[in-house]
A protein has these predicted regions:
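Long, contiguous N-terminal structural blocks used for assembly/anchoring
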Residues: 1-62
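Alpha-helix boundary/N-cap detector
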Residues: 10-14, 18, 26, 63, ...
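Acidic, low-complexity, intrinsically disordered interaction modules
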Residues: 75, 89-90
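A motif-centric signal for short, conserved binding hotspots located
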Residues: 78
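Non-catalytic, low-structured ubiquitin/UBL-interacting segments
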Residues: 84
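Short leucine-rich amphipathic alpha-helices used at interfaces
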Residues: 91, 95-97
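Short, compact, well-ordered microdomains
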Residues: 98-120
């Protein structure tokens, strides 16, 4: 784990498409119960997600989200600045992108990108 004392950012040399592809490669919907579907848009650097709808109490509620690489980068930075959150692979992600992290950190970043905070621990 790394203790962040200043703003931490994913290396800006990691291309947007690669950053998003790294997330898609985790096959997160198979591992994260709140995430129903995740697809990388081949035409634009954008992730399309279907995830739990926090405003709907029904069991299979879902809401669609479009998440850009900029949103992923901003969510990662926000989480590293939050003293309540510890990303175990933050140093590796800073140096090489989310493909060098772990599913737990990708989970936290995706939740923050969709909901503005971590909901599902």
């Amino acid at each position: 784990m790394i203790a962040m004392t200043e703003t931490a950012e994913i290396d800006p040399n990691v291309p947007d498409h690669q950053l998003l592809q790294d997330i898609a490669d985790y096959d997160a919907p198979d591992s994260l119960s709140w995430l129903h579907e995740l697809h990388l848009d081949p035409q634009a650097p954008m992730l399309h997600l279907s995830a739990e709808d926090l405003m709907d109490d029904s069991e299979d509620s879902a809401r669609d989200y479009r998440v850009s690489a900029d949103k992923i980068r901003a969510s990662f930075t926000a989480l590293t600045e939050d003293s309540r959150v510890k990303l175990c692979c933050a140093a590796e992600i800073i140096d090489g992108g989310l493909g060098y992290g772990c599913l737990d950190d990708v989970d936290a970043v995706l939740q923050h990108a969709c909901y503005g905070r971590i909901i599902f621990a």
